[in-house]
């Protein structure tokens, strides 16, 4: 089983985000993302949260998944506007993923 590298997980999340954002985000959020991403945008891999079971209804092994956030950072380099949180299987053969979109 080949694991996704952090760069691969980030690239996959960003590709999915670009493909699905228009169907899952409000037009104002899409405009904000497009206007601000070059200056303040971030795509970051974070420690996999253990509360995904509450979000998706399935118990997961945090070590088997990568969590990637896509959003905008503030002047303190903190991501304070998250457009999507991705849970992506580390198994490169299994492209399973879940997304929580900004509501």
From Swiss-Prot:
Domain of life of the source: Bacteria
InterPro entries per the UniProt record, alphabetical: dsDNA_mimic_put, Put_dsDNA_mimic_sf
Pfam families the UniProt entry points to: DUF440
Family label: Belongs to the putative dsDNA mimic protein family.
Functional note: May act as a double-stranded DNA (dsDNA) mimic. Probably regulates the activity of a dsDNA-binding protein.
Protein name stated in the entry: Putative double-stranded DNA mimic protein HAPS_1002
Native organism: Glaesserella parasuis serovar 5 (strain SH0165) (Haemophilus parasuis)
Lineage of the species this protein comes from: Bacteria, Pseudomonadati, Pseudomonadota, Gammaproteobacteria, Pasteurellales
């Amino acid at each position: 089983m080949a694991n996704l590298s952090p760069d691969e997980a980030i690239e996959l999340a960003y590709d999915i985000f670009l493909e699905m954002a228009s169907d899952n985000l409000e037009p104002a959020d899409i405009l904000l993302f497009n206007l601000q991403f070059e200056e303040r945008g971030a795509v970051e891999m974070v420690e996999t949260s253990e509360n995904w079971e509450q979000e998706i209804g399935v118990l997961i092994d945090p070590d088997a998944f990568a969590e990637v956030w896509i959003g905008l950072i503030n002047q303190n380099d903190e991501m304070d506007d998250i457009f999507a949180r991705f849970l992506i299987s580390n198994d490169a053969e299994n492209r399973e993923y879940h997304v929580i979109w900004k509501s």
